[in-house]
Amino acid sequence: MKFRKGELFCGPGGLALGAKEAKYMHPETGEVFEFEHAWANDIDEWACETFRTNICPDRPDSVVCGDVRELDIKSLGEKFGEIDAFTFGFPCNDYSIVGEHKGMEGNYGPLYSYGVKILNEYNPLVFIAENVGGLQSANEGKAFLGILNDLASAGKYGYKLVPHLYKFEEYGVPQRRHRIIIVGIRKDQDVAFRVPEPTHKEKYRTASEALADIPEDALNHEFTRHKKKVVEMLNHIAPGGNAWSESIPEELRLNVKKVRMSQIYRRLHPDQPSYTVTGSGGGGTHGYHWEEPRALTNRERARLQTFPDDYEFIGKKEMVRKQIGMAVPPDGAKIILEAVLKTFARIEYPSINSKWDFESVSAEQVIEEVQEIM
């Protein structure tokens, strides 16, 4: 069975690569369950080019680049056909725990509603929605519950929801990246999705394992030239430390009095997963090597996100950095998407309880769990 998949907010293709690699063959019937790319949309031109280059080089027109608010949703079906699956990692800017919380009143918060419009128009069998862990605390939990209710009632049939806070380091991603992923299966389907059991809960993949043996001529592997003072400061920061380390001489310390973010000039620890790879932020937020006094290259950042070395990101260095930081780790996505395929194949797989039971979750419960995000 092939699930033809559409995607909004596709970015450079992290979810799409996970879907492309996800496959399951039924042991008794031999039937193959897999996803097939139908169409995708994103507003970022460079991300669209990256997606086209790696996911659908033979069908570049299937990536519609433009503002989702101006997208002709009906024409997608007319041009590319019906879809059985739908994925969307709706923009997280207004829900992130880094910076000001805006939630439903922000510029990006309402964009999830375009995913609901796709569900209303095409009624796919299954959808997967992704957002940052901070979504659960936005607007005192009301944003999260509102989104869940809208998704559950979408389309002709409605959807059975399984929302869960995935800690991707527990699924083989060498990075502490926590994201809410909501899997919805159409209510007329007599199958039930369960959260796949973590694969690496006892032994995380480390930063040093992930960044080993990168070829010098690897794609997107340009090094950053730092000022002498930055190099000297990094030399005084131990692995896992940051710009506020007591070991830094006074003359090399940052002249910042009010805000002290832990990510500033923070070095990776070689024996632990990386901290979260981000797509935005100014100087000092690029992620720093534990041994060499320098920022990580984009290829190193892509490795931490589990993109293969032949996955080429298109655009200038800062544009590539943004794409990588905003993506869903393909390896983590693959595990979740294969669980979806096994669900429809009616195959049992190792699973755990979801963080929230949608039928009974309340705003109060959501707020009580906020401290578990990071």
Curated annotation (Swiss-Prot):
Listed PANTHER family: CYTOSINE-SPECIFIC METHYLTRANSFERASE, DNA (CYTOSINE-5)-METHYLTRANSFERASE 1
Family to which this protein belongs: Belongs to the class I-like SAM-binding methyltransferase superfamily. C5-methyltransferase family.
Active-site residues per Swiss-Prot or TrEMBL entry: C92
Gene Ontology MF terms: DNA (cytosine-5-)-methyltransferase activity; DNA binding
Protein name as annotated: Type II methyltransferase M.BbvI
Domain SAM-dependent MTase C5-type: 3-347
Organism: Brevibacillus brevis
Pfam short name (any one): DNA_methylase
Enzyme class: transferase
Gene this protein is translated from: bbvIM
Domain of life of the native organism: Bacteria
Disulphide bridges: none
Keyword entries, A-Z: DNA-binding, Methyltransferase, Restriction system, S-adenosyl-L-methionine, Transferase
EC assignment: 2.1.1.37
One annotated GO biological process: negative regulation of gene expression via chromosomal CpG island methylation
Catalytic activity, reaction form: a 2'-deoxycytidine in DNA + S-adenosyl-L-methionine = a 5-methyl-2'-deoxycytidine in DNA + S-adenosyl-L-homocysteine + H(+)
InterPro entries: C5-Methyltransferase, C5_DNA_meth_AS, C5_MeTfrase, SAM-dependent_MTases_sf
Lineage: Bacteria, Bacillati, Bacillota, Bacilli, Bacillales
